[in-house]
Amino acid sequence: MLKRAFFPPAILAIILIGGGVPSGWAQSAPPAPVSSNFGGELTSDFKYLANNFEADAEDIVTAPLHLDAAGAMLTNPRFYLIVGGAGAAFGGSFALDQTMRSHLRSMGSSTADLLQNVSYASVSASTAVLYGYGLYSGDSRARQFALTAGEGAGIATLIDIGIKAGFGRLRPSQSPSHTAFFHGGQSFVSGDVTPMFALAAGVSEYYDNTWYISIPIYSLALLDGFGRMGNDAHWFSDVVGAALLGVGTTELFLYLHRQHDENPGRFRVFPVAPPVTSTHGAQSVAPTGIGVAFSW
């Protein structure tokens, strides 16, 4: 179907498509200078992805060795607000499973497919335009947020495969009970919705979650969930669970990438130039190929 064939090229477009300026910037900022160093920017972005992908894997694998950081997190009230909010959202959606199904299951398949295709096209294009704007204007932050969103979408989709296998929930079309877990099904969580929310999170975060960006982009991502429910392929809690997974994965990688930027002395697949200081006590090691960059 169109919606399944569309998504892989759309993710690829995050890296390949150029041109276009986000509307929020067009209204609030003067025209950005046009960058003429596309080749250098693409090379820089490839190194950014490679360096952070390696560092992300290292951070996740070694996380059990840094439980002291978890202790600090547990003393932060914001942690409990986030966990409580996520739990309330999922619990509420689970309670509404049957109600939402009764209202959406009668949706025609053509309408449901249209909602899904609109969601795929708009969210993926928004992320691609953000990356294209970064190329056009030389805004590395825009490109990095788009690339991180793409990474989040890909990793969250892989995690979703494991969640489906672990919970085995039957789809609404397979069982009228929304508690039919561990029956070899693949309903929980939605693999279609997960990457949409991961991409939407990157766009929203680039604009500091400003409401006039966040509400439209997350609403467009949610259209995919409504389309899936219209096709009787998912429960409402499958959609909300997928949204939490997608957003959470992108937010995690954005956080980790900020930490990597603040620690330039760690191992890099591609060496990076250390930050310039006002003294003469700085020395850089920047060999070609695989290496390490240090800053004193």
Give, region by region, the residue ranges found by the protein language model.
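Membrane interface segments of multi-pass transport proteins and intramembrane proteases
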Residues: 102-111
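Extended ligand-binding clefts on enzyme/binding-domain cores
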Residues: 132
